[in-house]
Amino acid sequence: MIPNQGILGGHVIDLAGVSNNSTTLSVGGDMTQTQVVEVYTATWCINCVDTEHALMDALEGEDATVLVHHRFIGESQDPFGTQAGDDRWIALYGPTSQANTPPINVERSAPSVVFDGHRFVAGSAPNGDSLESDYAGMFADKHDYRSWNGVESDFTWIGDNSSGTVSWKFDVHPNEPSGMEWNHRLMVVEHSAYFPEGGNDLEYYEDVVRAVIDLDATLQDNGNEWGGEQQIDLPAAWDGDDLSLVVVHEWSIPIVESDTSEESRLPGFLAPLGLFALGAAALARRD
């Protein structure tokens, strides 16, 4: 579990068959139901196949947006990953991945699954009776911030399946913790990509994240919402016509390290005098 971060959002706009560059598509609403589930994988990863099948069985009938990220850095066998995708994964999940993959301690471990951007698990060995039951339990254990009733996320796409303009907004919760920081991103997802050369023989790779795009954000409506608008060029689909767009909102709360030393407990200018006094007392005791 990652205590100081998570993800809201997950609304999807399907661009399949959208060829008119003036097409307008919108989606949005309350974010408390949809859960973002992220997977880290590679086309050569054999044990990833079992974990992904178990995950999809666990999510059957659930309101989940699945984002499957493929390896890119140092990768020669998997064609689907991106630099931006790996950079984001390392920034969000790298330290937790290292802590959960001894003794190799890698920042990008395939397979890994993350629920809500908050609950992380690496590897293919179940902790309980089965991987499916593990994943079902992690999905059900949603973060409290997904219970923020009335917090909505909306976005609109004007364009076709190759380029367009995305505009979006996201409510600021009146009771969000002090110091909470947000990053907003657009994910371009391909529903299914055929790659028979994959070393794990899966051939069809589902929900592939083809691009990760940072969204510029400004506070709007007197500070009541975040929002923005920008022109986007989309990557070409690997095959077919099955791209979709997903907007996610990543929150984090900086961890402030508490200083419990003797010096930190002394106010301001008294600290040096206090340390001097402590030193004098120590000398007196030695005498």
Task: Show which residues each predicted segment covers.
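Proline-centered helix-kink/hinge sites
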Residues: 53, 110-111
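Short glycine/proline-enriched loop/turn "hinge" motifs that connect secondary-structure elements
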Residues: 28, 105-106
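Secretory targeting signatures
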Residues: 1-17, 34-37, 45, 262-287
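Short, conserved sequence motifs used for protein processing/export or organelle targeting and
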Residues: 78-105, 112, 126-265
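Short catalytic/ligand-binding loop motif for oxyanion handling, primarily in non-cytosolic enzymes
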Residues: 121-123
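Short loop/turn microsegments at loop-to-beta-strand junctions
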Residues: 35, 109-110
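Local sequence-structure signature of Cys/Sec-based thiol-disulfide redox active-site neighborhoods
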Residues: 4-11, 17-18, 22-76
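Short strand-turn-strand beta-turns centered on an Asx-Gly dipeptide
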Residues: 114-118
